[in-house]
Structure formats: structure tokens, C-alpha cells
């Protein structure tokens, strides 16, 4: 019976892979320090600004700054000179 019990009690590989992936995702989120929506927010802000002003993709920067108990959303937009608009 020892061999049958050994084979029967095995953790499924899909479950193991899922658990490992969840750990990796949690570690990456804590290392980044920011929520997942920041890249999407940056792209959407860029699209809205492009409707009115011609700017490059790297002209919009979005950062989340932790200031004690508060989170501050820092949005920086580098606008072109008047001649380039």
C-alpha cells in the first residue's frame, strides 16, 4: 500500500504551478511598490493629452509616492514649445 498511497497523495502539478505563480506575482507587486493600474493610467492620460497637443510617449510620467500614511499620485507632463503645438 505504500506505493499506492505515495502516488495518490501527490500534489497536482497544476496546483503547484498556480501556487508558485501567485507567490511570484505577489513578490513583483511588493517590489514595484505601485498598484497595477499606473501603466494603464499613464497610457490613457497620454491618449487624452494627444487629442489637444502633439507630444511624445515618454512625455507623461505617473508615479505613486508614499508619504507617511498618505499616497500621492505625481503626474508630470512635459509639454512642447509653442512652435511645436
Swiss-Prot record:
User: One Pfam annotation, family name?
Assistant: MinE
**Keywords assigned by UniProt?**
Cell cycle, Cell division
Q: Which GO terms describe its biological process?
A: cell division; regulation of division septum assembly
Q: Where is the signal peptide?
A: none
Q: Which InterPro entries match?
A: MinE, MinE_sf
Top-rank taxon of the source lineage equals Bacteria
Q: Enumerate the Gene3D superfamilies for this protein.
A: Cell division topological specificity factor MinE (3.30.1070.10)
**Keyword Cell division belongs to the record:** yes
Tell me yes or no: is Cell cycle among this UniProt entry's keywords.
Answer: yes
Task performed by this protein = Prevents the cell division inhibition by proteins MinC and MinD at internal division sites while permitting inhibition at polar sites. This ensures cell division at the proper site by restricting the formation of a division septum at the midpoint of the long axis of the cell.
Q: Which family does it belong to?
A: Belongs to the MinE family.
Q: What is this protein called?
A: Cell division topological specificity factor
The species this protein was found in: Xylella fastidiosa (strain Temecula1 / ATCC 700964)
Identify the coding gene.
Answer: minE
Amino acid at each position: 500500500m505504500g506505493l499506492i498511497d505515495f502516488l495518490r497523495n501527490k500534489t497536482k502539478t497544476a496546483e503547484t504551478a498556480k501556487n508558485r505563480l501567485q507567490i511570484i506575482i505577489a513578490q513583483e507587486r511588493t517590489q514595484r511598490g505601485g498598484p497595477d493600474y499606473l501603466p494603464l493610467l499613464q497610457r490613457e492620460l497620454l491618449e487624452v493629452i494627444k487629442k489637444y497637443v502633439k507630444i511624445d510617449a515618454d512625455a507623461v510620467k505617473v508615479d505613486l509616492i508614499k508619504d507617511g500614511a498618505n499616497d500621492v499620485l505625481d503626474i508630470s507632463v512635459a509639454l512642447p514649445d509653442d512652435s511645436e503645438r
